[in-house]
Regions:
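ATP-dependent small-molecule kinase catalytic core of the GHMP/sugar-kinase superfamily
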Residues: 40-44, 48, 52-68, 155-279, ...
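Glycine/serine-rich anion-binding loops at beta->alpha junctions
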Residues: 124-153, 171, 278-293
């Protein structure tokens, strides 16, 4: 009799334990479903300006041979990468295409092909860099995706390898991988890192227009008596830490082309000088104009005035080279 009683007790205990375990499993599953995605990475994509931009001629491959001093600035997009069943790119700007034509999408596909992995990620881009502005906004987002997937997949690729991959996406992408200050040659993809400049303050303004980079280069090819900036002297000044020497040598051979066709750019330049920014120059093929200021307060005052004139405007500072 005692034997059967113990058997009955053990059966009840076993049933309770089994039921409790099942409930715990259900609870764990519910908790897992409520959790954030396992993988979530955030990258900052800094805008770039050209401190110096010279065009040396047209290459056999139809690209232009350039020599530039490129500089990263703190105006930046935020790129968030999370796990997803399939590759998807979204932005907080409805006018910005997030599908396969987006450079960030192309960067994810390229990285997946290189790593032989499916890029099952959702990439969300919070835009703060002006669109179509000559500030490498799309290129810096693509570079951020390269860095982010390099971290996520633990590939351990150095900056130089990511830069070579980025060159397949666009001429500005290699610089945007690590940023800082750099001499760019070739079509812009051959980089020589330079010492970081101090965090100088600047104000930027963009008129409501878009400039086609191919158009700017085609128009440049028609120019006579081009005044070329002293890129070699600027590089020497950067290496010597001679900030006044750097600022004296600002120059962009595309500015007369774009400003000649769009007088608004010259007007912004004159306004910035009148309000206290100096020196002032257009970045890349335009239309964004930037000017250096003594302090952030001055920059914010000028930006406020320019915004009242229906211009996009922001204050930023120079930022150094990042680790990858």
């Amino acid at each position: 009799m005692l034997k059967y009683m113990w058997y009955f007790v053990y059966s009840i205990i076993f049933m309770f334990a089994e039921r409790s375990g099942t409930d715990l499993d259900k609870t764990d599953a519910a908790c897992r479903n409520d959790r954030e995605p396992f993988m979530k990475l955030t990258e900052t994509g800094y805008a770039k300006i050209n401190l110096g931009l010279d065009v040396l001629g047209l290459r056999p491959d139809k690209y232009h041979e350039v020599t530039m001093v490129m500089q990263a600035i703190s105006l930046a997009d935020t790129i968030t990468i999370t796990e997803s069943p399939e590759l998807e790119v979204t932005t907080d700007r409805p006018e910005l295409e997030g599908g396969p034509s987006n450079l960030a999408y192309k960067a994810a596909v390229l990285m997946g092909e290189f790593a032989r992995r499916e890029p099952r990620v959702h990439i969300h881009i919070e835009k703060r860099i002006f669109l179509t502005a000559g500030l490498a906004g799309g290129s810096t987002d693509a570079a951020a995706v390269l860095r982010g997937l390099n971290r996520y997949w633990e590939l351990g690729l150095p900056a130089e390898k990511l830069e070579r991959l980025g060159a397949k996406l666009g001429s500005d992408v290699p610089f945007c991988v690590a940023g800082g200050t750099a001499l760019a040659t070739g079509r812009g993809e051959i980089l020589t890192p330079l010492p970081d400049l101090p965090p100088l303050q600047l104000v930027l303004a963009k008129p409501q227009m878009e400039i086609s980079t191919p158009w700017a280069y085609r128009e440049f090819d028609k120019q006579k008596n081009v005044i070329h900036p002293d890129i070699d002297g600027m590089v020497q000044a950067v290496r010597a830490g001679d900030v006044p020497g750097v600022l004296r040598r600002l120059g962009n051979v595309l500015e007369p082309v774009t400003a000649g066709a769009h007088p608004e750019i010259g007007e912004i330049r004159e306004d910035m000088l009148a309000y206290g920014a100096e020196p002032v120059m257009m970045s890349g093929s335009g239309p964004t104009v930037f000017g250096f200021v003594k302090n952030r307060e001055t920059g914010e005052r000028i930006a406020g005035i320019l915004q009242s004139l229906c211009l996009e405007a922001a204050v930023a500072e120079l930022v150094g080279r990042r680790s990858v």
